[in-house]
Amino acid sequence: MLSANYIKECLKDAYKLPIEGVCKHEFVFDGLINDGAHDDVHGATTLDVAKRLLDFGFHAPTIYFPLLFHQALMIEPTETESKETIDAFIDVMHKIAAEAAEDPRILQEAPHGAPIGRPDETAAARNPILKFKDAQ
C-alpha cells in the first residue's frame, strides 16, 4: 500500500490520474498528461510507454485495463521492492514522459534492445503458434 501511494504521488505530475485519493495496492494512470486535445501525448500511447519500460529493465505493467480508461496503465508494485528500485522506476517513468514530449519516436520504436520488437499482437491472438516446430 505504501509503495503504490508513493509511486502515484511521485508520478501524478507526468501521468493523468483519473481517480484521486489513497489507493490500496494498485492504481491506474490514464496516459500521459497533455493539453487535453488528444488521448495521447505527441503520438505516444500507453503501449509505447509499456514497451519503452522494457528498455530500462522494468517489466511492462498491465495496460488498457480497466476498460473504463482509454489509455489505462495499471501500476501494481510489490511491497517487497526496495526503495531504491521504486525510485529507479519513478525516475524511468519521468524520463519516458520527457521523451514523449521531446521525441515520441523513441517510444514508438521501443523496445530497442529486445530480440523481438513489436509483433502483430492481433495476428498473434487470432493465430497463436503453440508449438516451437510450427514457428519454423
Residue ranges and their predicted role:
Residues 3-136:
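Non-catalytic terminal extensions of PLP-dependent enzymes
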